[in-house]
Amino acid sequence: MSRMAPPTGQHATTSTVILRPADQRFHSQLDWLDSWHSFSFGSHQDPNWMGFGPLRVINDDTIAAGQGFGMHPHRDMEIITVMVEGALSHADSMGNSAVLHAGEVQRMSAGSGIVHSEINQT
């Protein structure tokens, strides 16, 4: 079996998956938001938990009814929202709007920049 070298200027990398128990994740709590962070996020920074390859954020957010994230910017990233329960309204600066329901998934490409909001509709 032969192994191909990576293209010039790229490096071959291997990553080891490390199981991180839920009770060892970072936790943030506000009046309207209960959030568990698998990697360093916001004020929770640990150089040993910066992400996995290009993946930088996995947050498990519970948002109070009628509350959420007002319009805020992102760029140069893909954002995946997986709805476990409830309904979440999404609106963005590209004119897109939708309500996501339990069991649905949304992918948003921030590319050169986008502004969006996410509000719990339940």
Residue spans for each PLM region:
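Catalytic micro-motifs at enzyme active sites that drive phosphoryl/nucleotidyl and oxygen chemistry
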Residues: 69-70, 94-96, 119-121
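Short acidic-glycine-tyrosine-enriched beta hairpin
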Residues: 92-109
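Short beta-strand segments in beta-sandwich/barrel cores
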Residues: 62, 86-90, 105-106
